[in-house]
Protein backbone atom coordinates (compact mmCIF):
# COMPACT_ATOMS: atom_id res chain seq x y z
CA UNK A 1 0.00 0.00 0.00
CA UNK A 2 1.03 3.59 -0.64
CA UNK A 3 0.70 6.27 2.02
CA UNK A 4 -0.45 8.97 -0.44
CA UNK A 5 -3.22 7.02 -2.16
CA UNK A 6 -4.59 4.39 0.20
CA UNK A 7 -3.03 4.59 3.66
CA UNK A 8 -2.74 8.13 5.05
CA UNK A 9 -0.66 8.56 8.21
CA UNK A 10 -2.00 10.94 10.85
CA UNK A 11 0.99 11.16 13.18
CA UNK A 12 1.27 13.90 15.80
CA UNK A 13 4.37 15.76 16.93
CA UNK A 14 3.15 16.57 20.45
CA UNK A 15 1.97 14.15 23.12
CA UNK A 16 -1.75 14.64 23.89
CA UNK A 17 -2.23 15.80 27.47
CA UNK A 18 -5.07 13.32 28.09
CA UNK A 19 -2.78 10.31 27.66
CA UNK A 20 -1.37 9.10 31.00
CA UNK A 21 0.52 5.96 29.95
CA UNK A 22 3.04 5.41 27.16
CA UNK A 23 0.93 2.98 25.10
CA UNK A 24 -1.99 5.45 24.98
CA UNK A 25 0.39 8.27 24.04
CA UNK A 26 1.92 6.25 21.20
CA UNK A 27 -1.43 5.10 19.82
CA UNK A 28 -2.49 8.75 19.55
CA UNK A 29 0.86 10.12 18.34
CA UNK A 30 1.23 7.29 15.82
CA UNK A 31 -2.17 8.06 14.29
CA UNK A 32 -3.57 4.66 15.24
CA UNK A 33 -6.62 6.03 17.06
CA UNK A 34 -8.50 9.31 17.28
CA UNK A 35 -10.44 10.42 20.36
CA UNK A 36 -14.13 11.11 19.69
CA UNK A 37 -15.19 11.55 23.32
CA UNK A 38 -14.14 10.34 26.74
CA UNK A 39 -13.53 6.60 26.39
CA UNK A 40 -14.66 6.57 22.74
CA UNK A 41 -12.13 6.19 19.91
CA UNK A 42 -12.06 5.84 16.13
CA UNK A 43 -9.77 3.10 14.83
CA UNK A 44 -7.82 4.54 11.90
CA UNK A 45 -6.80 2.35 8.90
CA UNK A 46 -3.41 1.54 10.43
CA UNK A 47 -5.07 0.42 13.69
CA UNK A 48 -7.65 -1.63 11.86
CA UNK A 49 -4.81 -3.61 10.25
CA UNK A 50 -3.50 -4.48 13.72
CA UNK A 51 -6.99 -5.48 14.92
CA UNK A 52 -7.51 -7.67 11.84
CA UNK A 53 -4.20 -9.47 12.39
CA UNK A 54 -5.01 -10.16 16.04
CA UNK A 55 -8.50 -11.34 15.05
CA UNK A 56 -7.08 -13.68 12.40
CA UNK A 57 -4.74 -15.29 14.95
CA UNK A 58 -7.69 -15.82 17.32
CA UNK A 59 -9.97 -17.20 14.60
CA UNK A 60 -7.37 -19.64 13.30
CA UNK A 61 -6.76 -21.13 16.75
CA UNK A 62 -10.44 -21.36 17.70
CA UNK A 63 -11.51 -22.79 14.35
CA UNK A 64 -8.83 -25.47 14.74
CA UNK A 65 -10.40 -26.19 18.14
CA UNK A 66 -13.78 -26.93 16.56
CA UNK A 67 -15.42 -23.64 17.57
CA UNK A 68 -17.99 -21.94 15.32
CA UNK A 69 -18.03 -18.21 14.65
CA UNK A 70 -21.30 -16.28 14.81
CA UNK A 71 -22.49 -12.73 15.44
CA UNK A 72 -24.89 -11.90 18.26
CA UNK A 73 -26.98 -8.74 18.71
CA UNK A 74 -25.56 -5.85 20.70
CA UNK A 75 -28.99 -4.71 21.88
CA UNK A 76 -30.39 -7.04 24.55
CA UNK A 77 -33.94 -7.14 25.94
CA UNK A 78 -34.00 -6.50 29.69
CA UNK A 79 -36.28 -9.51 30.12
CA UNK A 80 -33.42 -11.95 29.45
CA UNK A 81 -31.16 -10.24 31.98
CA UNK A 82 -33.94 -10.14 34.55
CA UNK A 83 -34.38 -13.90 34.16
CA UNK A 84 -30.68 -14.39 34.93
CA UNK A 85 -31.06 -11.91 37.83
CA UNK A 86 -28.26 -9.67 36.54
CA UNK A 87 -30.24 -6.69 35.22
CA UNK A 88 -30.37 -4.78 38.49
CA UNK A 89 -26.70 -5.36 39.28
CA UNK A 90 -25.59 -4.24 35.82
CA UNK A 91 -27.82 -1.16 35.54
CA UNK A 92 -28.41 0.19 39.07
CA UNK A 93 -26.01 2.46 40.93
CA UNK A 94 -22.53 1.94 39.53
CA UNK A 95 -23.64 -0.75 37.07
CA UNK A 96 -21.69 -0.83 33.82
CA UNK A 97 -24.45 -1.49 31.28
CA UNK A 98 -25.77 1.30 29.07
CA UNK A 99 -29.55 0.90 29.08
CA UNK A 100 -32.44 2.53 27.27
CA UNK A 101 -36.13 2.30 26.45
CA UNK A 102 -37.60 2.02 22.96
CA UNK A 103 -40.68 3.86 21.64
CA UNK A 104 -42.95 1.30 23.30
CA UNK A 105 -41.25 1.78 26.66
CA UNK A 106 -39.51 -1.61 26.57
CA UNK A 107 -36.13 -1.79 28.32
CA UNK A 108 -32.92 -2.79 26.55
CA UNK A 109 -29.23 -2.88 27.36
CA UNK A 110 -26.12 -2.43 25.20
CA UNK A 111 -24.18 -5.63 25.68
CA UNK A 112 -21.05 -5.74 27.85
CA UNK A 113 -21.24 -9.56 27.58
CA UNK A 114 -23.53 -12.17 25.97
CA UNK A 115 -24.22 -15.04 28.42
CA UNK A 116 -27.99 -14.45 28.47
CA UNK A 117 -28.46 -14.22 24.70
CA UNK A 118 -26.33 -17.26 23.83
CA UNK A 119 -27.92 -19.38 26.59
CA UNK A 120 -31.38 -18.47 25.33
CA UNK A 121 -30.35 -19.50 21.80
CA UNK A 122 -28.83 -22.74 23.13
CA UNK A 123 -32.13 -23.54 24.85
CA UNK A 124 -33.80 -23.42 21.43
CA UNK A 125 -31.26 -25.33 19.31
CA UNK A 126 -29.76 -27.93 21.69
CA UNK A 127 -32.00 -30.88 22.47
CA UNK A 128 -29.78 -33.93 22.90
CA UNK A 129 -26.46 -34.97 24.40
CA UNK A 130 -25.54 -36.10 20.87
CA UNK A 131 -25.15 -32.42 19.86
CA UNK A 132 -22.61 -31.75 22.61
CA UNK A 133 -20.09 -30.30 23.16
CA UNK A 134 -20.67 -27.10 21.19
CA UNK A 135 -18.67 -23.87 21.26
CA UNK A 136 -19.62 -20.57 19.62
CA UNK A 137 -17.58 -17.37 19.49
CA UNK A 138 -17.76 -13.87 18.06
CA UNK A 139 -15.48 -10.84 17.66
CA UNK A 140 -17.53 -7.73 18.25
CA UNK A 141 -17.74 -4.28 19.82
CA UNK A 142 -18.78 -4.30 23.47
CA UNK A 143 -19.98 -1.42 25.65
CA UNK A 144 -19.26 -0.47 29.28
CA UNK A 145 -20.53 2.62 31.05
CA UNK A 146 -17.19 3.25 32.74
CA UNK A 147 -17.31 5.66 35.68
CA UNK A 148 -13.88 6.98 34.76
CA UNK A 149 -12.65 5.98 31.30
CA UNK A 150 -8.85 6.12 31.18
CA UNK A 151 -5.69 4.70 29.64
CA UNK A 152 -7.01 4.75 26.07
CA UNK A 153 -8.24 1.34 24.95
CA UNK A 154 -7.47 -0.21 28.35
CA UNK A 155 -10.58 1.17 30.03
CA UNK A 156 -12.87 2.57 27.35
CA UNK A 157 -16.61 2.74 26.84
CA UNK A 158 -16.40 0.85 23.55
CA UNK A 159 -13.93 -1.94 22.88
CA UNK A 160 -13.52 -4.95 20.61
CA UNK A 161 -13.65 -8.32 22.28
CA UNK A 162 -13.71 -11.99 21.39
CA UNK A 163 -16.24 -13.78 23.56
CA UNK A 164 -16.89 -17.51 23.32
CA UNK A 165 -19.38 -19.84 25.00
CA UNK A 166 -19.28 -23.62 25.27
CA UNK A 167 -22.05 -26.10 26.16
CA UNK A 168 -21.53 -29.54 27.67
CA UNK A 169 -23.35 -32.60 28.93
CA UNK A 170 -21.29 -32.96 32.13
CA UNK A 171 -19.05 -31.15 34.56
CA UNK A 172 -16.17 -33.40 33.51
CA UNK A 173 -16.58 -32.51 29.83
CA UNK A 174 -16.67 -28.80 30.70
CA UNK A 175 -13.50 -29.15 32.77
CA UNK A 176 -11.73 -30.96 29.93
CA UNK A 177 -12.74 -28.32 27.37
CA UNK A 178 -11.75 -25.53 29.78
CA UNK A 179 -8.21 -26.95 29.91
CA UNK A 180 -8.20 -27.20 26.12
CA UNK A 181 -9.18 -23.53 25.86
CA UNK A 182 -6.49 -22.60 28.36
CA UNK A 183 -3.89 -24.12 26.01
CA UNK A 184 -5.49 -22.35 23.04
CA UNK A 185 -5.26 -19.01 24.84
CA UNK A 186 -1.60 -19.61 25.56
CA UNK A 187 -1.08 -20.30 21.83
CA UNK A 188 -3.01 -17.18 20.80
CA UNK A 189 -1.02 -14.83 23.03
CA UNK A 190 2.26 -16.46 22.06
CA UNK A 191 1.36 -16.07 18.39
CA UNK A 192 0.63 -12.38 19.05
CA UNK A 193 4.21 -12.01 20.30
CA UNK A 194 3.20 -11.34 23.91
CA UNK A 195 4.80 -12.38 27.17
CA UNK A 196 1.84 -13.47 29.33
CA UNK A 197 1.18 -15.24 32.61
CA UNK A 198 -1.95 -17.20 33.54
CA UNK A 199 -3.25 -16.57 37.07
CA UNK A 200 -6.08 -17.88 39.24
CA UNK A 201 -8.80 -15.26 39.29
CA UNK A 202 -12.10 -14.22 40.79
CA UNK A 203 -15.14 -14.94 38.61
CA UNK A 204 -16.77 -11.60 39.45
CA UNK A 205 -20.17 -10.69 38.01
CA UNK A 206 -19.89 -13.42 35.36
CA UNK A 207 -19.95 -16.10 38.06
CA UNK A 208 -18.97 -19.75 38.01
CA UNK A 209 -16.83 -22.25 39.85
CA UNK A 210 -13.38 -21.56 38.40
CA UNK A 211 -11.70 -18.89 36.32
CA UNK A 212 -8.29 -17.92 35.04
CA UNK A 213 -6.95 -14.58 33.81
CA UNK A 214 -4.18 -14.08 31.30
CA UNK A 215 -2.00 -11.08 32.08
CA UNK A 216 0.57 -9.13 30.12
CA UNK A 217 3.19 -8.01 32.62
CA UNK A 218 3.68 -4.24 32.37
CA UNK A 219 4.36 -1.33 34.72
CA UNK A 220 1.16 0.38 33.51
CA UNK A 221 -1.02 -2.57 34.54
CA UNK A 222 -4.00 -1.83 36.79
CA UNK A 223 -3.96 -5.33 38.29
CA UNK A 224 -1.49 -6.88 40.70
CA UNK A 225 -0.20 -10.42 40.23
CA UNK A 226 1.12 -12.38 43.21
CA UNK A 227 3.38 -15.28 42.32
CA UNK A 228 6.20 -17.51 43.50
CA UNK A 229 9.65 -17.46 41.94
CA UNK A 230 9.41 -21.19 41.22
CA UNK A 231 6.20 -20.75 39.23
CA UNK A 232 4.27 -23.08 41.54
CA UNK A 233 1.62 -20.43 42.26
CA UNK A 234 0.20 -17.33 40.56
CA UNK A 235 -3.02 -15.44 41.22
CA UNK A 236 -4.36 -11.94 40.95
CA UNK A 237 -4.66 -9.99 44.18
CA UNK A 238 -8.46 -10.46 44.26
CA UNK A 239 -8.09 -14.25 44.45
CA UNK A 240 -4.69 -14.90 46.03
CA UNK A 241 -4.43 -16.78 49.32
CA UNK A 242 -1.44 -16.83 51.66
CA UNK A 243 -0.28 -16.85 55.26
CA UNK A 244 0.22 -13.44 56.88
CA UNK A 245 3.47 -12.63 58.62
CA UNK A 246 3.74 -13.82 62.22
CA UNK A 247 2.17 -11.47 64.76
CA UNK A 248 4.22 -10.00 67.61
CA UNK A 249 2.94 -11.46 70.94
CA UNK A 250 1.03 -8.94 73.03
CA UNK A 251 2.69 -7.83 76.26
CA UNK A 252 0.69 -8.13 79.48
CA UNK A 253 -1.30 -5.15 80.73
CA UNK A 254 -2.23 -4.36 84.33
CA UNK A 255 -5.78 -3.48 83.34
CA UNK A 256 -8.25 -4.69 80.75
CA UNK A 257 -9.12 -1.11 79.75
CA UNK A 258 -6.78 1.22 77.87
CA UNK A 259 -7.49 4.92 77.91
CA UNK A 260 -6.96 6.10 74.32
CA UNK A 261 -8.19 9.71 74.01
CA UNK A 262 -8.59 10.81 70.38
CA UNK A 263 -6.74 7.68 69.23
CA UNK A 264 -9.08 6.52 66.48
CA UNK A 265 -6.52 5.17 64.01
CA UNK A 266 -4.28 2.13 64.36
CA UNK A 267 -1.24 4.34 63.76
CA UNK A 268 -2.16 6.56 66.73
CA UNK A 269 -2.98 3.63 69.03
CA UNK A 270 0.34 1.92 68.26
CA UNK A 271 2.35 5.11 68.68
CA UNK A 272 0.81 6.15 72.01
CA UNK A 273 0.68 2.67 73.61
CA UNK A 274 3.86 1.02 72.32
CA UNK A 275 1.89 -1.53 70.28
CA UNK A 276 2.40 -3.21 66.93
CA UNK A 277 -0.42 -3.26 64.36
CA UNK A 278 -0.34 -7.08 64.38
CA UNK A 279 -1.50 -6.95 68.04
CA UNK A 280 -4.71 -5.11 67.16
CA UNK A 281 -8.01 -6.31 65.71
CA UNK A 282 -9.70 -3.65 63.62
CA UNK A 283 -13.43 -3.67 62.99
CA UNK A 284 -14.76 -2.50 59.63
CA UNK A 285 -18.48 -2.01 58.95
CA UNK A 286 -20.17 -2.62 55.58
CA UNK A 287 -23.74 -2.74 54.31
CA UNK A 288 -24.67 -5.39 51.73
CA UNK A 289 -27.42 -4.30 49.32
CA UNK A 290 -29.48 -6.90 47.46
CA UNK A 291 -31.68 -6.84 44.37
CA UNK A 292 -34.82 -7.30 46.50
CA UNK A 293 -33.93 -3.99 48.27
CA UNK A 294 -32.94 -5.70 51.54
CA UNK A 295 -29.82 -4.42 53.30
CA UNK A 296 -27.66 -6.42 55.70
CA UNK A 297 -25.21 -4.75 58.11
CA UNK A 298 -21.86 -6.56 58.03
CA UNK A 299 -19.33 -6.38 60.89
CA UNK A 300 -15.87 -7.60 59.87
CA UNK A 301 -12.76 -8.19 61.97
CA UNK A 302 -9.20 -8.46 60.72
CA UNK A 303 -5.70 -8.13 62.19
CA UNK A 304 -4.60 -4.51 62.31
CA UNK A 305 -1.68 -4.86 59.89
CA UNK A 306 -3.83 -6.57 57.24
CA UNK A 307 -6.44 -5.28 54.79
CA UNK A 308 -9.88 -6.59 53.89
CA UNK A 309 -10.28 -7.95 50.37
CA UNK A 310 -13.70 -6.63 49.36
CA UNK A 311 -13.96 -9.06 46.43
CA UNK A 312 -13.52 -12.06 48.75
CA UNK A 313 -16.00 -10.53 51.19
CA UNK A 314 -18.54 -9.86 48.42
CA UNK A 315 -18.26 -13.45 47.16
CA UNK A 316 -18.61 -14.87 50.67
CA UNK A 317 -21.78 -12.88 51.37
CA UNK A 318 -23.19 -13.69 47.94
CA UNK A 319 -22.60 -17.41 48.46
CA UNK A 320 -23.77 -17.52 52.08
CA UNK A 321 -26.80 -15.22 51.97
CA UNK A 322 -27.96 -14.48 48.41
CA UNK A 323 -26.55 -14.52 44.89
CA UNK A 324 -28.60 -11.37 44.21
CA UNK A 325 -26.08 -9.18 46.05
CA UNK A 326 -25.70 -5.90 44.13
CA UNK A 327 -23.16 -3.93 46.14
CA UNK A 328 -21.06 -3.89 49.27
CA UNK A 329 -20.42 -0.45 50.75
CA UNK A 330 -18.08 0.47 53.58
CA UNK A 331 -19.76 2.60 56.27
CA UNK A 332 -17.68 5.56 57.41
CA UNK A 333 -19.67 8.70 56.53
CA UNK A 334 -21.54 10.52 59.28
CA UNK A 335 -24.82 10.81 57.35
CA UNK A 336 -25.20 7.02 56.98
CA UNK A 337 -24.12 6.44 60.58
CA UNK A 338 -26.62 8.97 61.97
CA UNK A 339 -29.43 7.46 59.87
CA UNK A 340 -28.83 3.81 60.79
CA UNK A 341 -26.79 3.58 63.99
CA UNK A 342 -27.49 4.70 67.56
CA UNK A 343 -24.71 5.51 70.07
CA UNK A 344 -22.13 4.25 67.59
CA UNK A 345 -18.56 5.07 68.70
CA UNK A 346 -16.79 5.28 65.34
CA UNK A 347 -13.06 4.70 65.85
CA UNK A 348 -13.66 2.68 69.03
CA UNK A 349 -15.81 -0.19 67.73
CA UNK A 350 -15.09 -3.61 69.21
CA UNK A 351 -15.83 -7.08 67.81
CA UNK A 352 -18.42 -7.63 70.56
CA UNK A 353 -20.57 -4.59 69.80
CA UNK A 354 -24.21 -5.58 70.26
CA UNK A 355 -27.18 -5.42 67.91
CA UNK A 356 -28.84 -2.61 69.86
CA UNK A 357 -26.92 0.03 67.89
CA UNK A 358 -28.80 -0.92 64.68
CA UNK A 359 -32.28 -1.50 66.12
CA UNK A 360 -33.51 1.93 65.02
CA UNK A 361 -32.37 1.65 61.40
CA UNK A 362 -35.26 2.02 58.95
CA UNK A 363 -33.53 0.19 56.09
CA UNK A 364 -31.05 -2.29 57.59
CA UNK A 365 -31.71 -5.72 59.02
CA UNK A 366 -31.75 -5.61 62.83
CA UNK A 367 -28.80 -7.91 63.60
CA UNK A 368 -25.16 -7.93 62.54
CA UNK A 369 -23.72 -10.45 60.12
CA UNK A 370 -20.37 -11.01 61.85
CA UNK A 371 -17.37 -12.17 59.82
CA UNK A 372 -13.79 -12.55 61.06
CA UNK A 373 -10.67 -13.20 59.05
CA UNK A 374 -8.39 -16.05 60.14
CA UNK A 375 -5.70 -13.47 61.00
CA UNK A 376 -7.95 -12.08 63.78
CA UNK A 377 -9.36 -15.40 64.93
CA UNK A 378 -5.89 -16.91 65.38
CA UNK A 379 -4.68 -14.27 67.84
CA UNK A 380 -4.28 -15.50 71.43
CA UNK A 381 -4.71 -11.96 72.78
CA UNK A 382 -5.21 -8.59 71.17
CA UNK A 383 -6.32 -4.98 71.57
CA UNK A 384 -9.52 -3.72 69.97
CA UNK A 385 -12.25 -1.13 70.43
CA UNK A 386 -14.23 -1.12 73.68
CA UNK A 387 -17.44 0.33 72.16
CA UNK A 388 -16.84 3.33 74.39
CA UNK A 389 -15.38 6.62 73.14
CA UNK A 390 -11.71 7.20 74.10
CA UNK A 391 -11.19 3.61 75.32
CA UNK A 392 -9.87 0.35 73.90
CA UNK A 393 -9.80 -3.08 75.56
CA UNK A 394 -7.43 -6.02 75.89
CA UNK A 395 -9.12 -9.25 74.78
CA UNK A 396 -7.54 -12.52 75.93
CA UNK A 397 -8.88 -14.63 73.06
CA UNK A 398 -11.27 -14.38 70.14
CA UNK A 399 -12.93 -17.68 71.12
CA UNK A 400 -15.44 -16.18 73.57
CA UNK A 401 -17.24 -14.54 70.65
CA UNK A 402 -16.21 -16.69 67.67
CA UNK A 403 -19.40 -18.75 67.83
CA UNK A 404 -21.19 -15.62 66.63
CA UNK A 405 -18.73 -15.17 63.78
CA UNK A 406 -18.31 -16.73 60.37
CA UNK A 407 -14.56 -17.37 60.13
CA UNK A 408 -13.19 -17.09 56.60
CA UNK A 409 -10.39 -15.73 54.43
CA UNK A 410 -11.38 -12.13 53.68
CA UNK A 411 -7.84 -10.77 53.64
CA UNK A 412 -5.67 -9.29 50.90
CA UNK A 413 -2.66 -11.50 50.29
CA UNK A 414 0.46 -9.43 49.77
CA UNK A 415 4.09 -9.47 48.75
CA UNK A 416 6.30 -11.27 51.28
CA UNK A 417 3.57 -13.61 52.58
CA UNK A 418 4.32 -17.34 52.69
CA UNK A 419 2.12 -19.49 50.47
CA UNK A 420 1.57 -22.28 53.01
CA UNK A 421 2.73 -23.80 56.31
CA UNK A 422 4.59 -26.48 54.36
CA UNK A 423 6.55 -24.04 52.21
CA UNK A 424 9.00 -21.23 52.83
CA UNK A 425 8.29 -19.73 49.41
CA UNK A 426 7.25 -16.10 49.59
CA UNK A 427 4.92 -14.24 47.26
CA UNK A 428 6.37 -11.70 44.87
CA UNK A 429 4.38 -8.97 43.14
CA UNK A 430 4.22 -7.38 39.71
CA UNK A 431 1.70 -5.38 37.72
CA UNK A 432 -0.31 -6.86 34.89
CA UNK A 433 -2.81 -5.97 32.17
CA UNK A 434 -5.65 -8.46 31.80
CA UNK A 435 -6.09 -9.45 28.14
CA UNK A 436 -8.02 -12.72 28.52
CA UNK A 437 -10.30 -14.49 30.99
CA UNK A 438 -11.81 -17.97 30.94
CA UNK A 439 -14.59 -19.26 33.22
CA UNK A 440 -16.26 -22.51 34.17
CA UNK A 441 -19.80 -21.18 34.53
CA UNK A 442 -21.33 -24.49 35.53
CA UNK A 443 -25.13 -24.42 35.36
CA UNK A 444 -25.69 -20.87 36.63
CA UNK A 445 -27.24 -19.55 33.41
CA UNK A 446 -28.80 -22.74 32.08
CA UNK A 447 -30.82 -23.14 35.31
CA UNK A 448 -32.19 -19.61 35.18
CA UNK A 449 -32.83 -19.56 31.43
CA UNK A 450 -34.14 -23.13 31.21
CA UNK A 451 -31.49 -24.41 28.79
CA UNK A 452 -31.76 -28.21 28.95
CA UNK A 453 -30.82 -31.32 26.98
CA UNK A 454 -31.87 -34.97 27.01
CA UNK A 455 -29.19 -37.32 28.33
CA UNK A 456 -28.60 -40.95 27.26
CA UNK A 457 -31.51 -42.07 29.43
CA UNK A 458 -33.87 -39.46 28.01
CA UNK A 459 -33.82 -37.36 31.18
CA UNK A 460 -33.85 -33.56 30.89
CA UNK A 461 -30.78 -31.93 32.46
CA UNK A 462 -29.35 -28.42 32.63
CA UNK A 463 -26.51 -27.66 30.23
CA UNK A 464 -23.02 -27.12 31.60
CA UNK A 465 -21.40 -23.92 30.34
CA UNK A 466 -18.04 -22.23 29.96
CA UNK A 467 -17.21 -18.76 28.66
CA UNK A 468 -13.99 -17.38 27.24
CA UNK A 469 -13.08 -13.72 26.64
CA UNK A 470 -10.18 -11.96 24.92
CA UNK A 471 -9.76 -8.18 24.72
CA UNK A 472 -8.73 -7.68 21.09
CA UNK A 473 -8.07 -3.94 21.34
CA UNK A 474 -6.48 -4.49 24.75
CA UNK A 475 -3.99 -6.90 23.17
CA UNK A 476 -2.93 -4.17 20.74
CA UNK A 477 -2.29 -1.62 23.48
CA UNK A 478 -0.71 -4.17 25.84
CA UNK A 479 1.70 -5.17 23.05
CA UNK A 480 2.88 -1.55 22.90
CA UNK A 481 3.45 -1.52 26.68
CA UNK A 482 5.82 -4.46 26.20
CA UNK A 483 7.36 -3.28 22.92
CA UNK A 484 8.40 0.36 22.70
CA UNK A 485 11.42 2.62 23.14
CA UNK A 486 12.09 6.35 23.39
CA UNK A 487 11.29 6.81 19.69
CA UNK A 488 8.00 4.95 19.46
CA UNK A 489 6.37 1.56 18.99
CA UNK A 490 8.23 -1.62 18.03
CA UNK A 491 5.48 -4.05 17.05
CA UNK A 492 5.80 -7.83 17.30
CA UNK A 493 5.90 -8.78 13.62
CA UNK A 494 2.83 -11.05 13.92
CA UNK A 495 0.45 -8.16 14.69
CA UNK A 496 2.29 -5.24 13.10
CA UNK A 497 0.16 -3.35 10.55
CA UNK A 498 2.87 -4.04 7.97
CA UNK A 499 5.99 -6.18 7.91
CA UNK A 500 8.19 -3.67 6.11
CA UNK A 501 8.23 0.06 5.33
CA UNK A 502 9.95 1.48 2.23
CA UNK A 503 11.26 5.04 2.63
CA UNK A 504 12.63 6.88 -0.42
CA UNK A 505 14.41 10.01 0.83
CA UNK A 506 13.99 12.08 -2.36
CA UNK A 507 11.40 11.13 -4.95
CA UNK A 508 12.64 13.89 -7.26
CA UNK A 509 15.75 11.73 -7.80
CA UNK A 510 14.98 9.47 -10.80
CA UNK A 511 17.32 6.73 -9.54
CA UNK A 512 15.50 6.63 -6.20
CA UNK A 513 12.08 6.67 -7.85
CA UNK A 514 12.97 3.82 -10.21
CA UNK A 515 14.55 1.64 -7.49
CA UNK A 516 11.69 2.36 -5.09
CA UNK A 517 9.11 1.12 -7.59
CA UNK A 518 11.17 -1.99 -8.40
CA UNK A 519 11.53 -2.98 -4.75
CA UNK A 520 7.90 -2.17 -3.90
CA UNK A 521 6.52 -4.25 -6.78
CA UNK A 522 8.86 -7.16 -6.03
CA UNK A 523 7.77 -7.31 -2.39
CA UNK A 524 4.09 -6.96 -3.31
CA UNK A 525 4.39 -9.80 -5.84
CA UNK A 526 5.66 -12.07 -3.05
CA UNK A 527 2.58 -11.24 -0.89
CA UNK A 528 4.71 -9.41 1.66
CA UNK A 529 2.79 -6.85 3.72
CA UNK A 530 4.59 -3.70 2.58
CA UNK A 531 3.91 0.02 3.02
CA UNK A 532 5.52 2.65 0.79
CA UNK A 533 5.95 6.12 2.29
CA UNK A 534 5.70 8.12 -0.95
CA UNK A 535 4.89 11.47 0.70
CA UNK A 536 6.60 14.60 -0.57
CA UNK A 537 8.05 15.56 2.83
CA UNK A 538 11.53 15.86 4.31
CA UNK A 539 13.41 12.61 4.89
CA UNK A 540 13.75 13.45 8.59
CA UNK A 541 9.96 13.54 8.96
CA UNK A 542 9.68 10.11 7.33
CA UNK A 543 12.39 8.63 9.57
CA UNK A 544 10.74 10.01 12.71
CA UNK A 545 7.33 8.68 11.66
CA UNK A 546 8.84 5.30 10.78
CA UNK A 547 10.21 4.84 14.29
CA UNK A 548 6.98 6.15 15.81
CA UNK A 549 4.60 3.76 14.02
CA UNK A 550 6.92 0.84 14.71
CA UNK A 551 6.87 -1.39 11.59
CA UNK A 552 9.49 -4.15 12.18
CA UNK A 553 11.71 -3.49 9.10
CA UNK A 554 12.61 -0.36 7.14
CA UNK A 555 14.24 0.02 3.73
CA UNK A 556 15.89 3.42 3.25
CA UNK A 557 16.44 4.37 -0.40
CA UNK A 558 18.89 7.27 -0.70
CA UNK A 559 21.86 8.48 -2.73
CA UNK A 560 23.31 4.99 -3.07
CA UNK A 561 20.34 4.05 -5.25
CA UNK A 562 22.53 4.98 -8.23
CA UNK A 563 24.56 1.85 -7.29
CA UNK A 564 21.40 -0.19 -6.54
CA UNK A 565 22.23 -0.17 -2.81
CA UNK A 566 19.86 0.52 0.09
CA UNK A 567 19.91 0.56 3.88
CA UNK A 568 18.06 -2.26 5.68
CA UNK A 569 17.01 -1.55 9.30
CA UNK A 570 15.53 -3.80 11.99
CA UNK A 571 13.31 -1.62 14.22
CA UNK A 572 13.63 -3.70 17.40
CA UNK A 573 17.41 -4.18 17.39
CA UNK A 574 18.17 -0.89 15.55
CA UNK A 575 20.65 -2.87 13.44
CA UNK A 576 21.45 -1.23 10.07
CA UNK A 577 23.19 -2.77 7.07
CA UNK A 578 23.93 -1.55 3.56
CA UNK A 579 22.82 -4.13 1.03
CA UNK A 580 22.40 -4.59 -2.71
CA UNK A 581 18.78 -4.41 -3.85
CA UNK A 582 19.37 -7.78 -5.53
CA UNK A 583 19.84 -9.45 -2.13
CA UNK A 584 17.20 -7.44 -0.31
CA UNK A 585 14.25 -9.83 -0.60
CA UNK A 586 16.33 -12.78 0.56
CA UNK A 587 17.66 -10.76 3.50
CA UNK A 588 14.15 -9.70 4.53
CA UNK A 589 12.83 -13.27 4.38
CA UNK A 590 15.65 -14.60 6.57
CA UNK A 591 15.43 -11.74 9.10
CA UNK A 592 11.63 -11.85 9.32
CA UNK A 593 11.75 -15.60 9.98
CA UNK A 594 14.00 -14.89 12.95
CA UNK A 595 11.47 -12.39 14.35
CA UNK A 596 8.51 -14.70 13.78
CA UNK A 597 10.37 -17.51 15.58
CA UNK A 598 11.50 -15.27 18.46
CA UNK A 599 7.97 -14.06 19.08
CA UNK A 600 6.14 -17.38 18.86
Curated annotation (Swiss-Prot):
Stored Pfam families: HGTP_anticodon (PF03129), tRNA-synt_2b (PF00587)
**Swiss-Prot/TrEMBL catalytic activity:** tRNA(Pro) + L-proline + ATP = L-prolyl-tRNA(Pro) + AMP + diphosphate
For this UniProt record, give its keywords in alphabetical order, as a comma-separated list.
Aminoacyl-tRNA synthetase, ATP-binding, Cytoplasm, Ligase, Nucleotide-binding, Protein biosynthesis
Q: Which GO terms describe its molecular function?
A: aminoacyl-tRNA deacylase activity; ATP binding; proline-tRNA ligase activity
Q: Tell me the Gene Ontology biological-process terms attached to this UniProt entry.
A: prolyl-tRNA aminoacylation
Top-level taxon of the source organism? Bacteria
A GO cellular-component term linked to this record:
cytosol
Which InterPro entries does the entry link to? aa-tRNA-synt_IIb, aa-tRNA-synth_II, aa-tRNA-synth_II/BPL/LPL, Anticodon-bd, Anticodon-bd_dom_sf, Pro-tRNA-ligase_IIa, Pro-tRNA-synth_IIa_bac-type, Pro-tRNA-Synthase_IIa_type1
Role: Catalyzes the attachment of proline to tRNA(Pro) in a two-step reaction: proline is first activated by ATP to form Pro-AMP and then transferred to the acceptor end of tRNA(Pro). As ProRS can inadvertently accommodate and process non-cognate amino acids such as alanine and cysteine, to avoid such errors it has two additional distinct editing activities against alanine. One activity is designated as 'pretransfer' editing and involves the tRNA(Pro)-independent hydrolysis of activated Ala-AMP.
Which protein family is named in the record?
Belongs to the class-II aminoacyl-tRNA synthetase family. ProS type 1 subfamily.
User: How is this protein named in the record?
Assistant: Proline--tRNA ligase
The species this protein was found in = Prochlorococcus marinus (strain MIT 9515)
Per the record, the gene is proS
Amino acid sequence: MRVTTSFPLGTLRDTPSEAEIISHQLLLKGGYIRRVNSGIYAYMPIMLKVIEKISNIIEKELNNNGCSKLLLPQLHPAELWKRSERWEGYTAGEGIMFNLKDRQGKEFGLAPTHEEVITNIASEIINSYKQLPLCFYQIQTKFRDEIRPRFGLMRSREFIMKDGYSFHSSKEDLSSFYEKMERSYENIFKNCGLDTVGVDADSGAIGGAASKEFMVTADAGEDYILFTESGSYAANIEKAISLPSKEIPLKSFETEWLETPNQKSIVDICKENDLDASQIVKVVIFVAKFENKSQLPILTCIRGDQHINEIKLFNLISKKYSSNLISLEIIEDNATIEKNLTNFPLGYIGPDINDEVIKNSSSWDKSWIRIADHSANNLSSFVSGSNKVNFHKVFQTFSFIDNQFLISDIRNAKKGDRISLESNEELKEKRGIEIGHIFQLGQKYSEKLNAKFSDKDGKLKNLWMGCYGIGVTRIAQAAIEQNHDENGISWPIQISPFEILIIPTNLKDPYQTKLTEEIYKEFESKKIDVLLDDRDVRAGVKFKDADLIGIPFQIIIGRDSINKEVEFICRSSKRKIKISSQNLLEKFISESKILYNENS
